[in-house]
Amino acid sequence: MTTELLDRIHSPDDVRQLDRRELKALAEELRGFVLESVSRTGGHLSSNLGTVELTLALHRVFDTPHDRIVWDVGHQSYPHKILTGRRAGMASLRQEGGISGFPKRSESEYDAFGTAHSSTSISAALGMAVASRNAGIQRQHIAVIGDGAMSAGMAFEAMNNAGVTPDINLLVVLNDNDMSISPPVGALNRYLARLMSGRFYAAAKNVGRAMLQHVPPVLELARRFEEHAKGMVTPATLFEEFGFNYVGPIDGHDLDALVPTLQNLKALQGLQFLHVVTRKGHGYKLAEADPVLYHGPGKFDPAVGIQQGKASTRKTFTQVFGQWLCDMAERDERLVGITPAMREGSGLVEFERRFPRRYFDVGIAEQHAVTFAAGLACEGQKPVVAIYSTFLQRGYDQLIHDVALQNLDVTFALDRAGLVGADGATHAGNYDIAYLRCVPNMVVAAPSDENEARLLLSTCYEYPGPASVRYPRGAGRGAEISPGLDTVPMGKGIVRRQGRGIAILAFGTLTQAALAAAEALDATVADMRFVKPIDRELILQLAAGHDAIVTVEEAAIMGGAGSAVIEVLHHEGVVVPVLQLGLPDRFIDHGDQAALLAGLGLDAAGIERSIRARFEKSNLQSGAQTK
């Protein structure tokens, strides 16, 4: 792969020096480099292949970093990173100590706003535009948002606010690739499809180049766009009603269309909305054919594509959940499955196939997902909301006000609890224990392995109120999984190893590491299973029979399960040394999951080391003293 032009690019200033022919050639080199780079490190691929021309056009036309570009979600920002001096850093993409897979303000002045969760770009860019106006600074503010992210209410809240905000320059670029991760759903998607099928898009695609080679004066261009938008593609009035001047759709892979259009929009004042149509995976046929498979691949050979490896004997927790959901749906016709645009990631593909009338992908709309579930529960349905831990944060008010306050029967299956590895701090599910256990009526369960995940899912499903089961990303330990739908006693843990001196109270999958550490310490290990209701009887029993308590959790220490144990001891007036092990009070960057846990002292060796360091000067480690 030749990179003759790419080798000359060290900043967007270099892009602005290229002629039209060179710019098109650079697009091909940049796309090839993204493909080669991601195939070596893993990462988001399809979305980045689809934004190469758009990224080049934006940096060609706008004076970055003076002008602000905010990338919604941000997983499509690899071309942006490469063009802004981070090409060499792509070798360490999403690795510990390497560059992030998302825009990050601390990483580059070109990253105007940190993103990773969807639908925030318009709000952030609007805030920047108002700040620039107030400071008397003349600059452009661009929010690049995908069609999937546009389905979230926050995007429309921002546009509604922008429509009544005077004297600002704000350009919203809708990157319409008919995909988020899964294909987008809902009325907005149908609306955009009508736009793309309109005569204006057909005309722009067929004769756009000829028109733009003879670009008229700005005012005449604006007048013609207005005629097209209102007379030929009437649905565009939705965006115009918010106060935006709508332009498009145009071909997002045609630099001859993108560059002059952006140049003319830059010359206009006020609120502008550019609708570009791109193809996810563009330029790599395998990704074009299956953009979901190539959304976030691991390492692969681009010459042959992603190969199906030998199936692992260890199921992922996501797979365990998906199978349980189908099994429970067979037994209970009231079960309804809900996901906010994460069908594949949350394991609902088979459920959708088998129970299409009971499957609801509500789009990137976590607030709606939770209250939609509440409404179903009001009428006797049994909703299960399959959602990543980090995304439930977006529906927290609804969880409290609409579900828990009314004590409604909604089960939350929280995937990606704890550290998530390469996606880093933005996607880590570190806070669910703290933010859920304080909510009245809420059950919080944390299984130690795959089989226990199935047991706790059934237990929480049968509980007649709000309940959550948190489980991590990736495969379990290979535990044998019972095929039934058995339950366990609510709020009761179980002793997995009887020792002496020290009792380790483990919450979740770190139970396995705790058991390994306990072998060296001759410690007792309790698999607590529930954070709420917590097993008070077991805590007091272990405190009475041991010299010290150690709590272990893959969650934030502050407000976490260890805090719940201490609250029980304090309430009962029990004085015993307690060591809390968990995630520290800081955001934890991307890296390999196992390596990150080891670095935080949450592998078996680290747990043993922390216990010895805390109690080495006492005689609490009665077993360890003989080792």
Curated annotation (Swiss-Prot):
GO cellular component annotations of the record: cytosol
**Which pathway does this chain act in?**
Metabolic intermediate biosynthesis; 1-deoxy-D-xylulose 5-phosphate biosynthesis; 1-deoxy-D-xylulose 5-phosphate from D-glyceraldehyde 3-phosphate and pyruvate: step 1/1
Q: Where does Mg(2+) bind?
A: 147, 177
Which BP terms in the Gene Ontology apply to this protein?
Answer: 1-deoxy-D-xylulose 5-phosphate biosynthetic process; isopentenyl diphosphate biosynthetic process, methylerythritol 4-phosphate pathway; terpenoid biosynthetic process; thiamine biosynthetic process
What is this enzyme's class at the first EC digit?
Answer: transferase
InterPro entries assigned to the protein according to its UniProt record, in alphabetical order: Dxylulose-5-P_synthase, THDP-binding, Transketo_C/PFOR_II, Transketolase-like_Pyr-bd, Transketolase_BS, Transketolase_C, Transketolase_CS
Q: What does the similarity note say?
A: Belongs to the transketolase family. DXPS subfamily.
Q: What is this protein called?
A: 1-deoxy-D-xylulose-5-phosphate synthase
Gene label: dxs
